[in-house]
A protein has these predicted regions:
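Extended interfacial segments that mediate partner engagement and assembly in macromolecular machines
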Residues: 1-18, 22, 29
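Rossmann-like S-adenosyl-L-methionine
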Residues: 11, 39-174
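Short glycine-rich, basic-tinged beta-strand/loop micro-motifs
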Residues: 24-37
């Protein structure tokens, strides 16, 4: 993806006004978050759309802070997700929210942490800096009651949504 992305950026008329491009990898789709310092020229918008179609990625434009990122195409408005099948979890996230960059390492990390923690039904456990619910929901799946603590209100909302979507809302609080 790096080489095609480099080629794309090299032909964009607005390239000097694009300070960064972030990559977010999901199980069903990948996304590029393009930081834009000024509105893109129509030919650049078309080049980005063509790139998205050719490479099967979603393009988000971010004119300000992370909360301003929005999909270029309406069809891309659904959230990205990753799965933790060993815990029967599907975790939704937006491309600007923190997730572990390597899904295999994330799965291993959660498995090992839970093996060491060995949560039991009825236990009460706190997950500090819970983010989108990566560890919180895996712990809750064990039968423990979990308090997820997070400094970002947007991530708290996301974690609560993930708890609900995974049928764990009664076992967690944020």
């Amino acid at each position: 993806m790096i080489r095609p992305l480099r080629n794309l950026v090299s032909v964009l008329a607005s390239r000097s006004r694009l300070p960064q491009i972030e990559v977010a990898l999901g199980a069903g789709a990948d996304a590029l978050v393009v930081r834009v310092l000024e509105p893109l020229l129509p030919p650049d918008v078309e080049l980005l759309r063509e790139f998205a179609a050719r490479h099967g990625v979603r393009i988000y434009l971010q004119p300000g802070g992370p909360e301003t990122a929005s999909p270029m195409l309406e069809a891309d408005e659904t959230d990205l997700y990753y799965a933790l099948p060993e815990f029967d979890l599907r975790i939704q996230f937006s491309p600007t929210e923190f997730t572990q960059v390597n899904p295999a390492v994330n799965s291993l990390l959660v498995r090992r942490a839970l093996a060491l923690l060995d949560p039991q039904p009825g236990e009460r456990i706190a997950d500090m800096f819970c983010g989108v619910g990566n560890f919180t929901l895996a712990i809750a799946r064990s039968g423990a009651t979990v308090l997820g603590v997070e400094g970002s209100e947007a991530l708290v909302r996301r974690a609560a949504l993930n708890a609900e979507l995974n049928g764990l809302a009664a076992s967690v609080s944020f």
